[in-house]
Amino acid sequence: MNTTRSQAIFSAAQRLMPGGVSSPVRAFRSVGGQPIVFDRVKGAYAWDVDGNRFIDYIGSWGPAICGHAHPEVIVALQDALEKGTSFGAPCELENQLAEMVIDAVPSVEMVRFVNSGTEACMSVLRLMRAFTGRDKLIKFEGCYHGHADMFLVKAGSGVATLGLPDSPGVPRSTTSNTLTAPYNDLEAVKELFAENPDAISGVILEPVVGNAGFITPEPGFLEGLRELTREHGALLVFDEVMSGFRISYGGAQARFGVTPDLTTMGKVIGGGLPVGAYGGRAEIMEMVAPAGPMYQAGTLSGNPLAMTAGIKTLELLKQEGTYERLESTTERLIKGILEAAKAAEVPITGNSIGAMFGFFLCEGPVRNFEDAKATDTELFGKLHRAMLERGIYLAPSAFEAGFTSLAHSEADIETTLKAFRESFAAVA
């Protein structure tokens, strides 16, 4: 596979931007080799600057659930573009998307739009503390909630009740209020509440983990968190930036029947444009300025182009049979991946829900981030490169979920599984 232009462009980028990228995982540091520089995307495919075509299972890290550059989304954006790129003032499109989100997501009675998932999580953290009058929060090892200081706590070091900064520049005093527990471990959460009476504002988690690889909640875990937070007067927050509108139209909370107090969203609700949102019970959301005293603002929040793309995307997702089709596609994919690995005698465990999937190159089960770290990252790097050579674009990290879309055809899945069979055989 010729990647001459990608290599030249990335070489130049390294002189212009830290690491040559605008987000670290794109640099391929954890899988080796040079990153691919893309030229265009359409449907289930991405083309690089050298003309190579890939079947894409990243989908812009989640937003492209209808497929890249869906024709109806593009037409809607072209029409909206004629009216301007940004208003910096209220627009009716905000109302339309807000109504759609409120109708879909069980916990959301009011919503505030922002510009990214990180911004949504930063804002909801402030809101948790403002509403409860408490400073501490509980997060789970391996769960990612953006790069705000208080969320950058070292993961995978056991039940670290006093978080240590996971990045230079983050003061210990900032992360000292962040308590961590292993995912799927209710007893650890109970202990944190017992050790910090009347001090914990809430619990935030990815209800389905996608940033430590793909890890699903065990039966009773989400329900247990709901009971514990109510018992201790704390808030339960679902970070559905990744799972929202992807594992069901109402997200993980609709799928599992557990309603949090607050929810953060992003990715899918912007249809591929920068967006984030947070919402929840009206009595909590009414604390947000200008209705209440908790300040949060944004120059480009409620951007008409992002609202337009989000509205059209959700309209497409509401069509009959959408999620059944996504589920079937993803189940077929992960089943074939597991079979391919086992045929090559490669240890593997994996799973899927809705249009999310993931696998670890180790014996299962994987219940939390500590378990996930047993995956063979060196072997994954070899597998990633082998798949790339065969025209399949997987996330360049052993600790990221994969995504399918409505654009992935049966032929795409079969081509992908053929590549997995060949690649596992080559790297085993």
From Swiss-Prot:
Residues recorded with modification N6-(pyridoxal phosphate)lysine: 267
One Gene Ontology cellular component annotation held by this UniProt entry: cytoplasm
Record EC number: 5.4.3.8
Location relative to the cell: Cytoplasm
Catalytic activity: (S)-4-amino-5-oxopentanoate = 5-aminolevulinate
GO biological process annotation, one example: chlorophyll biosynthetic process
Record keyword Nuclease present: no
Cofactor: pyridoxal 5'-phosphate
Domain of life: Bacteria
Pathway(s) it belongs to: Porphyrin-containing compound metabolism; protoporphyrin-IX biosynthesis; 5-aminolevulinate from L-glutamyl-tRNA(Glu): step 2/2; Porphyrin-containing compound metabolism; chlorophyll biosynthesis
Major localisation: cytoplasm
Enzyme class: isomerase
GO molecular function: glutamate-1-semialdehyde 2,1-aminomutase activity; pyridoxal phosphate binding; transaminase activity
Family: Belongs to the class-III pyridoxal-phosphate-dependent aminotransferase family. HemL subfamily.
The protein's name: Glutamate-1-semialdehyde 2,1-aminomutase
Gene: hemL
